[in-house]
Amino acid sequence: MADIQDSGCGRYDNPGYYTGIIDMCAPIPLHRQSGVPGKVPGALLVARGIKNCIPLLHAPVGCAFQRKVNPFRPWDIFFDTPCSGITEVETVYGGNDRLFNAIKAVAGKYRPDLVLVISTCAPDLIGDDFESVIREVRKEIPCEVIYTTGNARRQPVGVQDALTSVIDQLVDEPAEKLEHGVNICTLPAHNATFKIAELKALLEEIGAQINGIYFIDSTVDQIRKLSRAKLNITDTRQEWCRLAENKFGMKSLALNQFQFKSLDDSPGTVSGTVKLLQHIARELDLGEPAYAAIERKKRQVENELARWKEKLQGKRIAMTFFLHGGAGSIMVKELGMECGVLIIKTPALSRSLKRESVEEMIRRVVDFIQRHQRSEPVVLFDPAPEDEIAAIKQNNIDLAVCGLNAVNLSAYLGRGIRVFDEGRFTRHHVRVGFEFVLNLAKEVARVFDRPVSRKTLLSLLDYSSGKERPHLTEYWANIAECFQSVWFCDVCECAGEGGK
């Protein structure tokens, strides 16, 4: 048997386990590069989303080291990550035999339904013949095997690379298409366990046929039938959808395209959800019964929302700028709350976006607020923590909506400011459908029902006095600044200063 390395631990797939541990791990600051969906961590995410799938890293042991922690979900762990362990010998003579034996060993030890072979730089450079190895090993093992490399001119991101391989090597040609078939496609990295139930129910209510939900604990048999649907609904634009369209004639719809067009069309709002469902009804040719069902659901939600709006309307909030609006903008539009202070932190945006793009996004948010309330908000650009708190006090703010870039929640509470933890709400309640705004209304009302707690354990820490990371202690803020400076260093500018 090949010498494969693994932790020997089982996997946990209980969504209820995550709630507390997510809150504990989510604030951990990560070096930006660890969050890039590179070849290995991205492919591991895909493996995590397929039931009884074991990823096999065809790599030197060094490449497989420290891949137990998922950088996108630090509360999650890849327990089973066997590695073929190629050495200098294979880099000279080729690693085909090593890969063949490793696949057999994994199939014998884990009894998986699918082995996902993940290649790395070394076998890619020496040109290991994955296709012929897998063709031969399939004759000797009872499970399916697919492989992913970066050689096929695919988008060089692990998630897209692996999903493209799944579509190319695992999905069957459909014997027949479902007339109104649709796939809901997402990943465990997007907390999908918490957000797809309502979307599925809404689609069925308007007459769509749910072919499958991918890729969250999907079985191999379910994945084989993916091509029976006419439409793939995805979180974001996905490279693999192009292959599915060319190979199986499937259309695709990226949910985030509604957010980019207009804050009013965000799927988190009532009108945005209605427009999304109407768009899907047109794509699937569901006819008038679908539009009637959408209108009935809209009236039902608006009636339920009216009770909460009566309680919250007119409350003044302070909110931080969010790229696609966030909870604060929905409070303004759907709950009738008034934004008195808008806090905009530009450094994080300016690092990765052009100045013109940043200014356009800010303009959109300000225009959105002005359309939905009578008064203009006080706009603060990169305020110091003390200035931020002072503005909230001076403008009679009832609730501070705190995102990641806000002053630490404990700092607000310590000054007697009532807070809404937008980060925690988003982690647990983000979803596509009407429940998002209803849950938001309930959570905001619950905050007003509780007294403001001035003294918390976290308020005893000394937080950074800088403008960029007031939510971190001075120690962690300095480390984060070091990583950010290294990551965003502009080579051209450095070269221009003396050519070094």
Briefly describe each language-model feature range.
Residues 1-500:
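An N-terminal assembly and electron-transfer interface module characteristic of large anaerobic redox
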